[in-house]
Amino acid sequence: GSRAPMTVELSPKIVTVMTREDIQRSAAQTINDVLKLATGVDVRQRGGFGVQTDISINGGTFDQIAIFLNGVNISNPQAGHNASDFPVALADIDHVEIIEGASSRVFGTSAFNGAINIVTKKASANGVEANVEAGSFGSLGAQGRLQMAFRSGKWEQAYSVSGGYKRSDGGTENSGFEKGQGYANLSLSYDRRLDIGAQLGIASQSYGANTFYSAKFNNQYEKTDHGIASLNVSVHNQGRTWEVTPAVYYNKFKDHYQLTRGK
């Protein structure tokens, strides 16, 4: 295996691509809902709306997959339980690529059973999106996205920024949650020979972890924070018969757990 560009038809592994049209038809509310639709992917949620989710492929464990955002590894090296702390919202996503089968040689040791790559939308025009939702048990959510696209000579520029918030008191004891995320993306292209991409994302959530880790304790609590940043450059000819792609990225998690809430 290699990271060389390749079509789905030529790939030696099973590759599933969930397009934006697939996502819209599915009526999914979270990224986890989208992943549930893929054959071979097992998604097990302990809480509602994507709160702490175990994601596995082909019968493996949640620690045996690698998760990428626009090709940047955002997996949690500490615990796969928090792999679903995505710094992007469903509205940001263009498509999701799922590779089934051992991929450690290409994507690192965590990709023992496969890999998931979330690809965000690239702005092609100026636009604004916003939505607000409310429901029972004190549920409330809001999401907004701003995008801009410009062309100046041989330069193409695309910018997008988004943010979201969701909370609920929960339908059972100690099952409430509060979560938020923010994401920004920059894309520059010159004459189909140079591409520069940068992204910055944060996600934070706190929730009642009722019997998450032990049935004896129903007043558990957990708070997680996830931050990512990356910069990548691609230098290539117009036919992309050769390509050089240096990249740097930052990926940090913080996890605070209380066996008994408030103690």
Regions flagged by a language model, labelled:
Residues 1-24, 54, 183:
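N-terminal periplasmic "start-of-domain" segments of outer-membrane beta-barrel proteins
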Residues 168-175, 179, 193-244, 250-263:
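Flexible loop and strand-edge segments within Gram-negative outer membrane beta-barrel domains
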Residues 23, 35, 96-97, 116-118:
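Non-catalytic regulatory/gating segments with a bias toward low-complexity or hydrophobic composition
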Residues 32, 36-76, 94:
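Extracytoplasmic beta-strand/coil segments of soluble accessory domains associated
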Residues 35, 116, 128-132, 159-163, ...:
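Membrane-embedded beta-strand positions of outer-membrane beta-barrel proteins
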Residues 62, 123, 151-155, 189-193, ...:
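Outer-membrane beta-barrel channels and translocator barrels
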Residues 115, 120-150, 162-163, 168-175, ...:
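Short strand-turn segments of transmembrane beta-barrel domains in outer membranes
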Residues 54, 72-100, 118-121:
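Short acidic/polar hinge/loop motifs at secondary-structure boundaries
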